[in-house]
Structures are given as C-alpha cells and as structure tokens.
C-alpha cells in the first residue's frame, strides 16, 4: 500500500514539474497545450470541436478558449481560416512547420 501511495505522489510531482516547465519555458498553459494537441491531431477543427474534446474534463469556460486560440495564433503556433459557406465558422489548423514545432514542445516536456 505504501509503495502505491509513493508512486501516486511521485506521479503528481512529475506532473507538476511538467506543468511548471510548460509555463516557464514555453509560456503555455495546460489549456494551451491541450488546444494545440487537439489541433495537431486534426486536419482542421472548429472551436466547438475543441470544446468537445479533452477540455471538457478540465471544465474550462468556453469564453476563455477564444482568448487562448487568439494567443496561439499570434504566437504562430496555429493558423485559421473562415468558412466560405458559413462565415461564423472558423477553422484552426497547423502547417508542417507548426506541427514540427508542437512535436518539439511535446518532446521537451
């Protein structure tokens, strides 16, 4: 029982260290990273699809996701385009160099 408890504690410490590294060195939050992962795994994705992904487990406010997406776009982690059929829809995606950049971030943490 003690061994299992120690492993859980160590896993939590490792997790906290990874989150701290993400914030300090990469200037990304956990939500930013999850958004990048969702976009990385999709050819293109809408904000609604992002919200229905892993972010549901974090109980993130939908209004904050737009801010996160704008920040990631300004930092050139992602690209976006507006649908020609429905201008309300914005699609987010990554080009090859952005995917490579994300892969490096994921590897570093």
Predicted features along the sequence, with ranges:
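Solvent-exposed, charged/polar functional surfaces in cytosolic regulatory/catalytic domains
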Residues: 11-18, 53, 101, 108
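Short amphipathic alpha-helical interaction segments
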Residues: 59-74
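Residues at secondary-structure transition points
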Residues: 3, 26, 30, 60-63, ...
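N-terminal leader segment of winged-helix/HTH proteins
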Residues: 1-26, 30-33, 76-77
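Charged, amphipathic alpha-helical coiled-coil/dimerization segments
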Residues: 71-109
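Residues within the helices of the helix-turn-helix
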Residues: 48, 52, 70, 90
């Amino acid at each position: 029982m003690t061994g299992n408890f120690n492993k859980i504690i160590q896993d939590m410490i490792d997790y906290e260290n990874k989150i701290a590294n993400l914030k300090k060195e990469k200037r990304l939050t956990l939500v930013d990273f999850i958004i990048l992962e969702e976009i990385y795994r999709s050819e293109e994705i809408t904000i609604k699809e992002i919200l229905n992904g892993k972010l549901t487990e974090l109980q993130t406010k939908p209004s904050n996701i737009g801010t996160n997406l704008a920040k990631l776009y300004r930092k050139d982690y992602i690209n976006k385009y507006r649908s020609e059929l429905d201008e309300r829809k914005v699609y987010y995606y990554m080009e090859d160099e952005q995917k490579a950049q994300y892969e490096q971030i994921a590897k570093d943490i």
